[in-house]
Amino acid sequence: MADEELVKKMVRAVLQSSKSGLSLSDLQVEYKDLTGELIPYKQLGYVTLDALLHSMPSIVKLDKGQSGEVMCHATTGNEMAHITKLAARQRTAKKTGRPQVVNCQMRVKPAAPLVLNAKPRTSLRQPDHRGRLGRGGGRGHGDTRTGCMRDPQLDGKGGRPHNTPPNTPSRKPSLPSERPEKRMTLPSRFQKEVHAHILRNPQHINVPSNLNENTTPPKPRLPHSAPYSPKLVQSRLQEVLNKHSNGLWVSKLPQLYREHYKQDLPSEALKELENWTHICTVEKPCSSKPQELLLYPAKETSQITPTPTHDRSPSHHKKPQTQRPSLTAKSNTPESPKALSPDLKQKLGELLLKYSSGLWAHALPKLYQDTYKCKLPEFVLDQLTLLSDICTIDYPVPDNPKRAILYAKVVEDENRNQSGLAGQEMKLERRLSSQTVPPLVIPRVEYPSVLVVDASDTNCVILRYIGEGYSKAQEKLEDEMREFYRQDNTKMALRSPSPGQLTAVGAEEEDDIIRAQVCEVMADKVKVYYVDHGFSEVISIRKLFELNEKFYRLPFQATKCKLAGLESFSQEQAVLKKLESIATGKILLAEILEREDMPLVVLYDTSQDDDVNINAACMKALQDRSLESPLKVNSAYMNVSVTSVCSDGTIYCQVPSRGLTKLNEILEKTENYFHSQVTSESLVSRPFCGKNCLARYKGKWSRVEITNLHGSRVLDILFVDVGVQASVEVIELREIPPPLLRDLISTPAQALKCCLAGLPVSVGLWTPDAVQWLRDTVLHISDCSLKIAKVDETKRLAHVYLFTSKNFHDTSCSLNQQLADSDLWNHQKDVFLSSRGPLKSLNVPTATQTSSLKTDRGDKALHTPKKTSPPLGSKSTPAGSPPERLSLPPALELPEIGQNMDVFVSVACHPGHFVLQPWQDMYKLVVLMGEMILHYNKMEEKALKVEKNQVCAAKVENNWYRVLVKGVLTNGLVSVFQLDYGKHELVSGTKLRPLTQEFCQLPFQAITAQLAGLKPRQWSEEASIVFRNHVEKKPLVAQLESVQEASQPWERKVMIYLVDTSQEERDIWLHDIMAEFTDEMTKTA
């Protein structure tokens, strides 16, 4: 079964790669190179390919070429923008009439591929068992629940609220409990759901739908060469454990056994491991999966320090995941203490509390020494069980038990919380004259839309949430109020208002009635606060009416928030003026960092071509423009330092100026401050995009701005004063010292962005050799000279002539001219360079690896360098050969047929094709992706010969993924399949890197699935939308029906039942919903 939307996307990709157009035959060839098959026009119901293309006017434009042959061209237009129009009513403090409609084209910030800062709860609530008759053919319905079930919101880790995934609410249809009582008007309900989906999400999921492809038969299991012999297995097990004296995972034992002895490990042996105490010791370090046990040689038990019983028997402990035996026990371990000192425990607890999303154990020694100026005792890492009372310990890397993550235990004072809540309720009742209104609940979506009403203080910004349940509910309420008070309202007039009383207020110019609260009572006037619109006004007392009780049900819509990063400058006029001009009265997106009574947020304006970080823009308003680097045409500067050279020819320089002198003085004070402080207060515990902080660059503290977050532990930063990008762990960042905060914020960035005059700045026009030569020539030279030829104010880009001597009067001696005249500038065919330079490691120089090119200091003739890394596509490139053959990870372990597993649906095309991920192991994938980002973003661009069916790493947007190459286009684009998410992407060939064995330990997480309980059919787009709305991006429970094995993990397919157990009162079986939808559509057809 062909998916027409997938075909359209592939056709568009092929056509966009050819500017001159393609003939029908060439289109078929290019399409097959990309997808592995011809365009399936017959399967889509078209007699000819030409007929199919004519049905895609938004994709293909057909015309005749000079030879009379039909040519296909990509259609241009804005249909690819995929933007959503959001509308909301807006009031201003000057007018209380009928709210006007504010139209705003908003581009929703892309959500993370998964909850990167969260560890999924241990398990979801499991559904009730149902017989085959209850599920067969999709004739059953959602179960109605009356019994008490385990709360699905509980996190298996107990005290880490920040590590739970966000709730994923969905509007579920109300299903009848019995088939005969079918009173549902399904066609209209589903029609509304489909219509709403199309309006807010016009793009289609790019997933293959053909489940009828032939698959390679599964590999036969290795037979046992002899009957099961316990003694033989025990002797072999001793040999394996002797080679892994520090322990190994039980899940890895069958693979190691097979590699050593060319036989499968008998299943009976796995069941008897715990009884073979003379051979091995079995430990259970964490509870994320019951089969993840650690195995140690039995002889180690005599070397490990005797510990209390609860440490050695974690399976009987209340929190077994915190128990961990020493993996590096040595003969001197008896000298190690059995408990931490109170001072050491307090300091470690402070560090862990700073990183609520977890802290790598291996990072603890350096962080401890940097913070407290003393060395962490070695026994702490050797015996992590000593930390069990202040943190929980997890082991996300199966092949490396030493790579533990520590989570601080948060103990809540329940009595204090209850008393505080009671006090708030009493205060609310007094304020509302015994009438209560439910509190406003913060939207659960990742980036809610908000309307900024008032911004007179960054610590108290008044806003309203936009969307279902918020602005739309308010509109409905005010419509009801208008109808209600349109009757004889003289009897409803409020004669004696009192401060704090809720009331209804008639608008001045129109018939609107809105809710308000009395603030102050005067002679014949009152000052009221409009609780849904966030402003105050003095009005006549005759406009007050008694607020009927039925209008108390909706929470007050005007709420307050704090803008992150601006806490110390909340009243600065420059900040408030900027905020007023770019935020007030506009619909923005809010990223909620803290979900408190007054949430901490970052605001984004996504209505323009580029996203605008409102918080960062307000912070820049504090900068002293007189300290900026000078940009005057025809001016020459000496003692210039080139700090960065990008692959597109852009360079960053530091020019002597007052700003640079002041910056160096402040950074010197910063060094002294950190040397003298012994505290954890400077650690960055809550990073966010646009935040200004400090990180080490070449051993010294430098200013950075966070540009992107990859979860809670790995992030991208920009060294604003040198123009260098890097990927680091959050533990490497420090807050700007409070005494120096204003001075550092007010000093503009000192990296001057330049390009070489006369040479183009564009992707692909600079050869690798030209970039390398320029880096080798100018980096780390502090006395270059430059002359400004032109200034582009819009981009703040200076076109300059660059010299390595002080002879800047003669432009013929400039590096610009030398590059233009050299052979290095001759562009080689099929060379692709990224528009940005590679992200640098903080521990290496800014330049790439230095080649053998040597230039004197007098700007003499250019010498030809020795090529250190031949460009991509060079026939003589040995580095372009395929990488060493990887040992692919084992296939993902599935439960037995008929058993349940918790899953997350990452991609949903239709019931015949969707992709699952194991819910319990999602955090392991987060850890893996963070490690890949740190690894690949520090690598230089290298040639990689791309081949079909090759497994490698690919950079998609800002993340690195494990991918399978599906096809290669002639223009350098590569079609890849994400092995952990099940998505198809088109990426540049320069974004591919060899996948190292280190990243092949975790099984590929994507599981291709088909919904059981339904007859095979070709699903309509309406049915696909209904299915996606119910399952995509949601945690569900899957019951395994069958498995179609294959030779490769990504070819394996499963048939499952899906159950939504998020509602406590009933289970929703998805095949029931789809079967009922199909039945109703058949009846109405």
Swiss-Prot record:
HTH OST-type domain sequence ranges: 3-76, 229-299, 340-410
GO MF entries: mRNA binding
Biased composition (Polar residues): 203-216, 322-335, 843-853
PROSITE patterns reported in the protein's UniProt record: HTH_OST, TUDOR
Any one GO BP annotation for this protein: P granule organization
Assigned keywords, A-Z: Cytoplasm, Differentiation, Repeat, RNA-binding, Spermatogenesis
InterPro entries: LOTUS-like, OST-HTH/LOTUS_dom, SNase_OB-fold_sf, TDRD7_LOTUS_3, Tudor, Tudor_domain_containing, Tudor_TDRD7_rpt2, Tudor_TDRD7_rpt3
One family name in Pfam for this protein: OST-HTH
Domain Tudor: 496-554, 686-743
Disordered: region residues: 112-183, 200-228, 297-341, 843-888
Any one Gene Ontology cellular component term annotated for this protein: P granule
Function: Component of specific cytoplasmic RNA granules involved in post-transcriptional regulation of specific genes: probably acts by binding to specific mRNAs and regulating their translation. Probably required during spermatogenesis.
Name of the featured protein: Tudor domain-containing protein 7B
